[in-house]
Amino acid sequence: YPPVKRVTAISFISTSFMLSGIIGQNLSEILSNAYGWRVTYIVLSVLYIILTFVVSKLVPESPYRNPDIKLSRFMSHFKDIFLYKSVIGCFFISLTLLTNFISMYTILNDYIKSHFVHGDLTTTFVVKLLGIIGMILSLFAGRISDKLSVIWVIKIALVAQIISLIGLGITSNIVIITFFSIVFVAGIAFCIPSVISKVGMLAATNRGFFLSVNTFILFLGTAIAPVLSIYLEKLTHYFVAFSILSLIALAALIVSFFIPKGINPDTAK
């Protein structure tokens, strides 16, 4: 893809796995409540088998191959990370995104069903599904980044996350909660492709390596989120839980101000 369309292309990819996160949660809850948790794993296994068959038949092989690549050579690139200090900032932002995304929905699920909101299982399903609106809006990230620059899209998206998390903690109105959840999801959905694009811009060499590391760190957040959620669910006030998540987003916002607007200044010499 040309650079102009790269952010848009990445937006489609990131939207797909965020979409699977929302649909997957709803599907698993429906199956678990109706048939038991074992059926959930059986259904998912069948879906993966079908998906494997579809991918093997319909997805073409990549025309770009390098059989000379060795694992030892790939691992040796880790020392280059410290040459790209701005990329480390992007890695930190990536770590916070899915951590907050999964943690927010875990807390939100409990919050809606609490005595503060008086929602039920159907209400949580609807609120989660409406979050898809925020994901669809992120498909315009490429066009917006062309107008504002990638780093400004990242900053605005992080601000949207902070405001929406605070908003979720101070209201018990289900309509307002739904609105803020959509804004939050949009902030995450805008931020992911923008950060990936920024990593590619900052890494003058070994872009594939740095993008691979960024992807690993991004999904590392999915492992951190359940652990974080356990502690957040023990808090007596939901406002405190949402505030902690907003502080994580605030830390990412502060880091974003140390990331240059253009290419890595260390490699532009």
Can you say where each PLM-predicted feature lies in the sequence?
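A membrane-interface helix-boundary motif in multi-pass transporters
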Residues: N33-S45, Y231-A249
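Juxtamembrane intracellular "pre-TM" segments in multi-pass secondary transporters
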Residues: P60-C90
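Helix-to-loop junctions at the C-terminal end of transmembrane segments
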Residues: L137-S149, E233
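A late C-terminal transmembrane helix in Major Facilitator Superfamily
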Residues: M201-Y238
